[in-house]
């Protein structure tokens, strides 16, 4: 748990401003936007370069992997599909809860170039009536971008809120992935079957615990 972990921190410079990463030897704990930088309307900015607080030898593997993943994401998001994800060791991943189940399902199922509604994600997590609880899980996501809560939208097609950095950041991330932010209603997007991959399959990420 967080209180017993020896935490390490690093700051990553991105087109969205500074992003703080924190983790321990057992896994990544958090990704946090530090600055309220208004993202450019054009996501094709200069590649991000990480700024490390402390030498690379001081960083646990989880932070090294997360830095590598984010650097690839901001340069070419599709390239992240072949990269390993860090182990996750935030307390939310150490207990059996609906929030953990929702976040894990989102990470495994909703891939690059895809979106899902809150209600659809609730169904994927085993409770189709829990759309509001899914919204709470998105607000409590400790590792935004890595677990792509920006790909979860409202059933009416609006993109909804984004606690990771505000609606402008959510729009930027979707545009960066080549997803139009002005969409028809979610039920018309063909998200089940055609836009979403089957819930089976494997992922290279792992929960540490």
Curated annotation (Swiss-Prot):
It catalyses: a 6-O-methyl-2'-deoxyguanosine in DNA + L-cysteinyl-[protein] = S-methyl-L-cysteinyl-[protein] + a 2'-deoxyguanosine in DNA; a 4-O-methyl-thymidine in DNA + L-cysteinyl-[protein] = a thymidine in DNA + S-methyl-L-cysteinyl-[protein]. The modification Phosphoserine is found at residues 14, 205. Its EC number is 2.1.1.63. Zn(2+) binds at residues 5, 24, 29, 89. One of its GO terms (biological process) is methylation. It is found in: Nucleus. One of its GO terms (cellular component) is nucleoplasm. InterPro entries: MethylDNA_cys_MeTrfase_AS, MethylDNA_cys_MeTrfase_DNA-bd, MethylDNA_cys_MeTrfase_DNAb, MethylG_MeTrfase_N, MGMT_N_sf, WH-like_DNA-bd_sf. Residues 35-57 are annotated as: Disordered. The keyword DNA repair applies. It is an enzyme of class 2 (transferase). GO terms for molecular function: DNA binding; metal ion binding; methylated-DNA-[protein]-cysteine S-methyltransferase activity. The keyword Ribonucleoprotein does not apply. Its main location: nucleus. The active site is at 149 (nucleophile). Keywords: DNA damage, DNA repair, DNA-binding, Metal-binding, Methyltransferase, Nucleus, Phosphoprotein, Transferase, Zinc. This enzyme catalyzes only one turnover and therefore is not strictly catalytic. According to one definition, an enzyme is a biocatalyst that acts repeatedly and over many reaction cycles. Involved in the cellular defense against the biological effects of O6-methylguanine (O6-MeG) and O4-methylthymine (O4-MeT) in DNA. Repairs the methylated nucleobase in DNA by stoichiometrically transferring the methyl group to a cysteine residue in the enzyme. This is a suicide reaction: the enzyme is irreversibly inactivated. NCBIfam families: ogt. Belongs to the MGMT family. This is Methylated-DNA--protein-cysteine methyltransferase. It comes from Cricetulus griseus (Chinese hamster).
């Amino acid at each position: 748990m967080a209180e017993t972990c020896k935490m390490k921190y690093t700051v990553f410079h991105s087109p969205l401003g500074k992003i703080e990463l924190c983790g321990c030897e057992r896994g990544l704990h958090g990704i946090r936007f530090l600055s309220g930088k208004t993202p450019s309307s054009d996501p094709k900015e200069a590649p991000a370069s990480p700024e490390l607080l402390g030498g690379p030898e001081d960083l646990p593997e989880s932070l090294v992997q997360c830095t590598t993943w984010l650097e690839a994401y901001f340069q070419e998001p599709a390239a992240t599909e072949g990269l390993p994800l860090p182990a996750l060791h935030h307390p939310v991943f150490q207990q059996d809860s609906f929030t953990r189940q929702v976040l894990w399902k989102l990470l495994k199922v909703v891939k690059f170039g895809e979106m899902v509604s809150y209600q659809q994600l609730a169904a994927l997590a085993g409770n189709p009536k829990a759309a509001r609880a899914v919204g709470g899980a998105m607000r409590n996501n400790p590792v935004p971008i890595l677990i792509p809560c920006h790909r979860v939208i409202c059933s009416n097609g609006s993109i909804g809120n984004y606690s990771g950095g505000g609606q402008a950041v959510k729009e930027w991330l979707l545009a960066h992935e080549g997803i139009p932010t002005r969409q028809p209603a979610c039920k018309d997007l063909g998200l089940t079957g055609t836009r979403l991959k089957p819930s089976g399959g494997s992922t290279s990420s792992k929960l540490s615990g």
